[in-house]
Amino acid sequence: MSSAVVASSTTFLVALASSASRGGPRRGRVVGVAAPPALLYDGRAGRLALRAPPPPRPRPRRRDAGVVRRADDGENEAAVERAGEDDEEEEEFSSGAWQPPRSRRGGVGKVLKRRGTVPPVGRYGSGGDAARVRGAAAPAPAPTQDAASSKNGALLSGRDDDTPASRNGSVVTGADKPAAATPPVTITKLPAPDSPVILPSVDKPQPEFVIPDATAPAPPPPGSNPRSSAPLPKPDNSEFAEDKSAKVVESAPKPKATRSSPIPAVEEETWDFKKYFDLNEPDAAEDGDDDDDWADSDASDSEIDQDDDSGPLAGENVMNVIVVAAECSPWCKTGGLGDVAGALPKALARRGHRVMVVVPRYGDYAEAQDVGIRKYYKAAGQDLEVKYFHAFIDGVDFVFIDAPLFRHRQDDIYGGNRQEIMKRMILFCKAAVEVPWHVPCGGVPYGDGNLVFLANDWHTALLPVYLKAYYRDNGMMQYTRSVLVIHNIAYQGRGPVDEFPYMELPEHYLDHFKLYDPVGGEHANIFGAGLKMADRVVTVSPGYLWELKTTEGGWGLHDIIRENDWKMNGIVNGIDYREWNPEVDVHLQSDGYANYTVASLDSGKPRCKAALQRELGLEVRDDVPLIGFIGRLDGQKGVDIIGDAMPWIAGQDVQLVLLGSGRRDLEVMLQRFEAQHNSKVRGWVGFSVKMAHRITAGADVLVMPSRFEPCGLNQLYAMAYGTVPVVHAVGGLRDTVSAFDPFEDTGLGWTFDRAEPHKLIEALGHCLETYRKYKESWRGLQVRGMSQDLSWDHAAELYEEVLVKAKYQW
């Protein structure tokens, strides 16, 4: 048998004999396992011998970096008295020094920094290269692996596991007594053979810690849970390389111990390695504001984390939105509805919603791809096949419904007789309501949960009706909602009552369609039924919502709107700055035009004005005001009011440019004006997107004498380009154009209160006088108009509020 085995066996027998001679195991000592042997000097025998370390001396109650150690008197003091038989041995262990135990491989062993534990004595005694802690209490015997791996991971004192002390993981050595104050602890360098750790000194008095090798647990930071099982983060080696006075080795955590009920539990938290081992603290102390620096650093880190982890703008209100419209820019557009259907979905998608636009496929669109889905729907007694095409652009799914009824109607999407129009709209609404089930956008259909349909005008007013009659009344799509947007209530889908069977609805739904008015008598009104069935209703401006409640502005639906006023909201449209922005407008990058901003307004806009005059064959003059009109040629837009005021306009030193298409008699009127006043007037019959952009940029004034205008977009485009609007104060025009006040230097343009020629002449006269005589006030009007936030982002936020209301409406 080897000498090492003999020495170990001898030590174990000596420990058992010592325990038996003193009356067996006592409370306050670790029993059943011998302490690691130490080579000590035996004073009586006069030689070195392998002996177990003496029992611990009493330790006062003290606080060291947030860890409370408790030492009791009583039995522990008796054990210390018994341990004082050897004077030299007493000198060895009463000097206040203790040494972290070495591992079997020669490295520094594990140090327990738990509440109530006592630092163990080194395996080879207290001498040698161990660090000495001056002013510390006497050491405790080091437990072996069996003792240290008890179920609570702490040093037990001989009590049963079900006692409060053992459940606490504390070392209980006797009755509790008041703790005595202890001087601050300082630790000298530890020249351990593995990787010694030398923490930098600090100016302010505080205890320092020696971090053992990778096998030992690190002490917990102040205020943290010493029993937390969260591992330490790996330190940044580059940081430690810069600080020559410190070298830290990562250590593994000890098993987590539970607490007994009498002592309140400490909330567990993950250790912040950098915050605890404050290696930059000496530099901060020299600056005198170390706490503030670290507070600022923590604040900046939290801001960065918040930005990195920030969710969608919609927050918890993210939902699936399907916008259904008969037209959508840039594929098919006849008015403002096409702009809304093309821009609003992108703004909603930027807020985090999953958005789809469903529109008929009037032509061959290169972006759209056939998804391979074929469905059959009955419209006006016929079974018609429907195909679905899909394109993903700017975060929005665009789904095009293809059917023979829609093809080759790119230039006349609302044309045909009433039966043809009705058949197209019935087929479109039936196919659109089932799109979330059949079309796998991105491989995943939208489904009918957390879904809101956003229908637009009477062309899609049947969608809320079909959603309720076909699905919700039959227990399907219970969490799907519908919102109907009123862009122009003058078009309602009115027809005879005997057309109701073509819609293929239950008979009792006829009551929702029937309306009576003094002029047309009893009729079926599709828009009226949609307003009743929709969960929410939106108008394109607050002013237009007010007008719809009046007898004149409601166009026969004012009673229905008043009854459903509780679910109606007015939201002003926005503009798409990627298309309507003088700074990046692609139509201003050729033919002598120029892009400009507010800063370059004085140079860019005159260039556009001169280029427009040359392109249209007008005299290039910077001093003459250039007036523009862009719109549909019909009674609503009030172009005939301009015709009645033409004698006065022709007598002024001005230039007039009109662009639009519509009623034939009004188109002829534009051509006649150009022929009569060739040096001042230009009439462009038809619609050109490029010319609309160039007139908006080159004109000084834009006139909009609309008899009614739900919202209007041209006045928004004009103000964004620094063109001053002169409008009839109605609907959305009243909401978006505030009257100019020369005394307060406020306002965005001129307004008149009645759609009459003399009112237009009066407002236009004040405008021209300001242009000629008050250049500073005129430039203020331009700058204020260009400085507004007219984007769709603000409107999308308001639409989102309406969608949320519809979602939680039952």
From Swiss-Prot:
One of its GO terms (cellular component) is amyloplast. Changing V737M: Loss of activity. Loss of activity. GO terms for biological process: starch biosynthetic process. Gene3D superfamilies: Glycogen Phosphorylase B. The keyword Chloroplast applies. InterPro entries: GS/SS (IPR011835), Starch_synth_cat_dom (IPR013534). It comes from the Eukaryota. Its EC number is 2.4.1.21. Residues 63-83 have a biased composition (Basic and acidic residues). Residues 1-16 form a transit peptide. It is an enzyme of class 2 (transferase). Expressed most exclusively in endosperm. It catalyses: [(1->4)-alpha-D-glucosyl](n) + ADP-alpha-D-glucose = [(1->4)-alpha-D-glucosyl](n+1) + ADP + H(+). ADP-alpha-D-glucose binds at K333. Keywords: Amyloplast, Chloroplast, Glycosyltransferase, Plastid, Starch biosynthesis, Transferase, Transit peptide. Residues 102-116 have a biased composition (Basic residues). Residues 129-148 have a biased composition (Low complexity). Pathway: Glycan biosynthesis; starch biosynthesis. Residues 84-93, 281-310 have a biased composition (Acidic residues). One of its GO terms (molecular function) is alpha-1,4-glucan glucosyltransferase (ADP-glucose donor) activity. It is found in: Plastid, Amyloplast; Plastid, Chloroplast. Plays an important role during endosperm starch synthesis. Determines the type of amylopectin structure of starch grain. Synthesizes long B1 amylopectin chains by elongating short A and B1 chains, independently of the other soluble starch synthases. Barely active in japonica subspecies. Belongs to the glycosyltransferase 1 family. Bacterial/plant glycogen synthase subfamily. Increased activity due to variations in subspecies indica is associated with the synthesis of the L-type amylopectin, which contains much lower proportion of short amylopectin chains than the S-type amylopectin found in most japonica varieties. The difference in amylopectin chain composition explains why starch from japonica subspecies has a lower gelatinisation temperature than starch from indica subspecies. This is Soluble starch synthase 2-3, chloroplastic/amyloplastic. It comes from Oryza sativa subsp. indica.
